């Protein structure tokens, strides 16, 4: 396989087309062409390479194109002033802002049909992962057929099917109404719609709850409304103070710590986190189910000490940048 390799020396970047092959259980890499030091000219340089590389380049087109676009927007951001952040390093901030720049300058300006197709691709990834984190056994390919063709997977419970279909409905409602204000009504409605046909206990819980396999104490039932009032107040006070990803990540953690509902807190929290991002001009993110243990560990560490928020926010940033260039390009 071939891919682009970036070598950084000081403040300068140099690009190479690199080939990787497995031989006798070992991976051998070799630089086969120097592509220059300007990411904006790399695409042209690749087109000028000898025909013997065409087949391999075509096979790796998406990987190569992803690299070029991501680094093109990263270079644009590097030339701009970025406000220092206590939770994110400059490198991580630059990667987030590169996604934001492409989101606003390219993706959101695409024609409606293209946007809807890409949003559907995102929804499939998001719905599969957010429900899988909670134990849904529907596979990605099955989720795709269910959400795009309404083909019900065999031997799956109605709960699992509703789980995905409800996520689809709520997601597109947010996409079509990004200006919705974050308040008690929106939070309750988001939860109730996500749990429709799954758990009919609506509204904030009136009973104490223990979180299965999670070692933390949620807000006692009599204080849920008071803590949710404080959370919404905190959100409103910090909306223009914190970086949107930091705001969304910290809101998510605080929400999960309160655990305001009897069930569906994780799914609701991840949906609200994406609503916060999009309402503030930032792209959406997918927390992958394969990262479940790391994700829960980061949430738990922040429970014990808010100084660990940095680890949680950096985790969210990594999930955003990875999912963005894989889906929205």
Residue ranges of predicted features:
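FIC/Doc superfamily catalytic core
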Residues: 1-263, 268-329
């Amino acid at each position: 396989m071939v891919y682009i390799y970036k070598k950084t020396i000081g403040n300068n970047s140099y690009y190479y087309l690199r080939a990787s092959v497995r031989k006798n259980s070992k991976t051998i890499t070799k630089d086969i062409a120097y592509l220059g030091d300007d990411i904006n000219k790399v695409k042209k340089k690749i087109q000028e390479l000898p025909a013997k590389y065409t087949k391999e380049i075509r096979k790796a087109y998406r990987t190569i194109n992803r690299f070029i676009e991501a680094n093109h927007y990263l270079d644009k951001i590097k030339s701009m002033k970025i406000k220092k952040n206590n939770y994110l390093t400059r490198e991580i901030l630059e990667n987030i802002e590169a996604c934001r720049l492409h989101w606003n300058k390219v993706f959101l300006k695409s024609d409606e049909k293209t946007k809807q197709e890409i949003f559907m691709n995102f929804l499939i990834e998001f719905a599969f992962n957010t429900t899988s984190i909670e134990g849904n056994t529907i596979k990605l390919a099955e989720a795709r057929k269910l959400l795009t063709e309404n083909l019900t997977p065999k031997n799956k419970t109605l709960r699992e099917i509703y789980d995905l279909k409800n996520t689809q409905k709520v997601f597109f409602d947010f996409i079509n109404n990004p200006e919705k204000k974050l308040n008690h009504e929106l939070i309750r409605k988001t939860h109730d719609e996500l749990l429709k046909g799954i758990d009919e206990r609506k509204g904030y819980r009136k009973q104490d709850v223990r979180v299965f396999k999670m070692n933390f104490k949620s807000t006692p039932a009599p204080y849920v409304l008071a803590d949710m009032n404080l959370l919404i107040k905190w959100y409103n006070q910090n909306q223009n103070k914190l970086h949107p990803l930091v705001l969304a990540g910290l809101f998510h953690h605080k929400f999960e710590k309160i655990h305001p509902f009897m069930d569906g807190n994780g799914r609701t929290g991840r949906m609200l986190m994406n609503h916060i991002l999009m309402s503030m001009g930032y792209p959406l993110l997918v927390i992958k189910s394969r990262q479940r243990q790391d994700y829960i560990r980061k949430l738990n560490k922040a429970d014990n000490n808010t100084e660990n928020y940095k680890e949680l926010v950096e985790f969210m940033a990594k999930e955003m940048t990875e999912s963005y260039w894989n889906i929205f390009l």
